Amino acid sequence: MTLTAGVVAVQGDVSEHAAAIRRAADAHGQPADVREIRTAGVVPECDVLLLPGGESTAISRLLDREGIDAEIRSHVAAGKPLLATCAGLIVSSTDANDDRVETLDVLDVTVDRNAFGRQVDSFEAPLDVDGLADPFPAVFIRAPVIDEVGADATVLASWDGRPVAIRDGPVVATSFHPELTADVRLHELAFFDRTPSAQAGDA
């Protein structure tokens, strides 16, 4: 059965996420049909969604203007998986600590935007992630931090004592960019019954 995956194609690493979900699906013996989402009407056709990074205020405005935000909320309410990364985490949150960001309120967290500094301060670090046997090569670029975690959410990984990956029901969100590595285990963790394959980060 083909997996229909939608990538919100407003900003961010759209092609990288598309490639990652194809590799993750292939690792589980399942073909993937990847669709780019720019207007309403595509989300209801998708089994899984990816919300990449970019600029959170711009992303939230476009989602609201096009009516994609309501479709994403319905997708999550139906128990369908969503992987949100970096600015996608901010937009997905309950509270972005920024009135300019219209959040989706599908991830019960409060977020501190750009908590890990400017783009020049970006870094990569091996990260222990709950559910993964080996450290994940996490790429942080002006990354947000999860300040507060709701009762139903679970912290999957922390860096320097602060949460940077979380699961809330069908939503997995990361402060870092899993699509910028050859390691697709985070995409597997989000979309394939929480059973990532035994794939090394340099595969």
From Swiss-Prot:
Cysteine disulfide links: none
GO MF, any single term: glutaminase activity
One Pfam family here: SNO
Binding residue positions for L-glutamine: 54-56, 113, 141-142
SUPFAM superfamilies to which the protein is assigned, alphabetical: Class I glutamine amidotransferase-like (SSF52317)
Entry keyword Amino-acid biosynthesis: no
Biological role stated in the UniProt entry: Catalyzes the hydrolysis of glutamine to glutamate and ammonia as part of the biosynthesis of pyridoxal 5'-phosphate. The resulting ammonia molecule is channeled to the active site of PdxS.
Subunit-level organization: In the presence of PdxS, forms a dodecamer of heterodimers. Only shows activity in the heterodimer.
PANTHER family: PYRIDOXAL 5'-PHOSPHATE SYNTHASE SUBUNIT SNO, PYRIDOXAL 5'-PHOSPHATE SYNTHASE SUBUNIT SNO1-RELATED
Protein name: Pyridoxal 5'-phosphate synthase subunit PdxT
Gene for this chain: pdxT
